[in-house]
Amino acid sequence: MDKTSRRDLLKLASLAGIGAGLARSQGSSKSMAGVSFKPNGTVRIGVIGTGGRGGSLIENFSAVEGVQITALCDTVKDKVLKQQAWLDKAGKASHPIALFHSDDHAFENLVKRDDVDLVVVSTPWVWHTRMAVAAMKQGKHVAVEVPAARTIDECWELVNTSEATQRHCIQLENCCYGYNEMMVLNMVRAGLFGELTHGGAAYNHDLRSILFSAEGEGEWRRFEHLNRDGNLYPTHGLGPVAHYMDVNRGDRFDTLVSMSSISASLQQYRKEKIPAGDPRQKEVYKEGDFNVSLIRTVKGRVIELEHNVSSPQPYDRINLIAGTKGIFRDYPPRIYFDGARREDFETLDRYKEKYEHPLWKKVGELAKELGGHGGMDFVMAYRLIQCMKEGTPPDIDVYDAAAWSAPGPLSEASVANGSAPQKFPDFTRGKWQTRQPV
């Protein structure tokens, strides 16, 4: 593996987004669709990226019974030592913990260790695919933060590597494990919405202060806005809707069209908040403030997908699902079914006793105590470890990681070509037609 520096990779990241690509499968020996983990009573985890998000994942995974954090890696030594100290104080370090922090490629030593079953990747996006592939090639399952890939070539690289190594690549889409999302999934499964026709998904989140921060995500995330224009972060809203619609398990994303607004809000924020003469004043942002994409599935369903992290606004993932019998929309959560006495939404309250998801009934109180986006982070961690310990397939596999990440590069290609339609590859190689729903 070449020793490309982090600075060089971040520069390349700014130029790589348009690579919607014409990548094709290289073939494989066996699909990973429906493949179970080998049952394992103790799951040993190595974490790459121990900053803010990585630290939160360490806290949530280590709270699951049967988990051992055996290795930590970050380019900043103090971040590794901070997490080691936390594990020790929390009584989670009764076993040796290997530490890696020499340079940008220290992770290559972590993934080679024989005391790691699962590698968790929580780093800048440009490293996600590279690190996930390295882990799988060393015989490790990998759980990678979102988006798992930034180009269609990277999506195929994840799929091909997972199939070739027979190791799972799980995208850590925590929003699939939110209370409302899992409850609504139960209601969808019970047929309350009838035949599904439409979904709505978004990542609308005012990140201006984070993007211009001198630390954390501010050190790299703003650079994604310099030479990319599309939906840079599609999975938080899209993942739950994909589960509602059985995408990759009875239906499949088929076509996407996308358009972006002008880029104005980051410039306005910079003008008001950043001192004159600061090097950031010279940055030219390509990413539009608001991107909207439409996805059509093979079955003819339509999903509206939004992205806006640059404007003053309340947080909103939309989380909408509609069918022939009713509609649900989140933020705030409200629901309407055909035949209601009045033409107005109602709250979810009277449905909770019957349709609350079993996972939330089982670990919801502990999840809320730990926090982590309202508890969804712990439910996600608990469920993945449950699958590994019991020997069942993961809820979110490499085909989901690829399909849910693909709107990023496909939206860029559509925007760059006058909102021209873009076709989704079939990452499952036809298996979507026979797979069982989550």
UniProtKB/Swiss-Prot annotation:
Pfam families, per database record: GFO_IDH_MocA, Glyco_hydro_109_C
Ligand binding (NAD(+)): 52-53, 74, 125-128, 145-146, 174, 233
UniProt signal peptide: 1-33
Free-text description of this protein's post-translational modifications in UniProt: Predicted to be exported by the Tat system. The position of the signal peptide cleavage has not been experimentally proven.
Keywords, sorted A to Z: Glycosidase, Hydrolase, NAD, Signal
Record-linked InterPro entries: Gfo/Idh/MocA-like_OxRdtase_N (IPR000683), Gfo/Idh/MocA_oxidrdct_glycsds (IPR050463), Glyco_hydro_109_C (IPR049303), NAD(P)-bd_dom_sf (IPR036291), TAT_signal (IPR006311), TAT_signal_bac_arc (IPR019546)
Binding residues annotated for substrate, in chain numbering: 203, 221, 233-236, 315
EC number: 3.2.1.-
Essential cofactor(s): NAD(+)
Function summary: Glycosidase.
Homology family: Belongs to the Gfo/Idh/MocA family. Glycosyl hydrolase 109 subfamily.
This protein's name: Glycosyl hydrolase family 109 protein
Phylogenetic lineage: Bacteria, Pseudomonadati, Acidobacteriota, Terriglobia, Bryobacterales
